[in-house]
Regions:
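Positively charged, low-complexity terminal tracts
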Residues: 1-125
Length: 125
């Protein structure tokens, strides 16, 4: 049996998730002076096939009503990236304006990821 993690996002949540993914990826690549996947640390992960699969899944989800379907290792990458992003970007819960909206969206996204992690869909291999 294989675990599949399914997450449904609103358009606004998915846009926020994609924006975070793009900024994290660009910051990672900028530190390495280029688009080289090998031997690059991506928020603690090697730039490997799981990161590439997450990249592909993000593209597919945009075409599939903002729904992600991830296997365990790819799900782990997404969850780790989002937790680290939240930790590295100090959000003041009393803030107002655009920062407040991102703070709320990041919390919603992390809740959906966490909930999905508790209820994987089991599929035959």
């Amino acid at each position: 049996m294989r675990e599949i993690f399914e997450m449904h996002f609103t358009r606004e949540e998915f846009d926020c998730l994609q924006s975070i993914w793009q900024s994290v990826r660009q910051a990672t690549w900028a530190r390495q002076y280029g688009d080289q996947w090998s031997n690059v640390k991506f928020y603690g992960f090697e730039m490997n096939e799981y990161v590439q699969l997450l990249e592909y899944a993000m593209t597919r989800a945009g075409e599939d009503n903002n729904t992600l379907h991830l296997t365990r290792p790819v799900f782990d990458v997404l969850q780790s990236v989002m937790i680290k992003y939240q930790q590295e970007n100090i959000f003041d819960p009393n803030m107002v304006g655009p920062g407040r909206k991102e703070f709320e969206l990041v919390n919603i996204i992390l809740t959906k990821i966490t909930d999905s992690g508790k209820n994987p869909i089991l599929v035959e291999e």
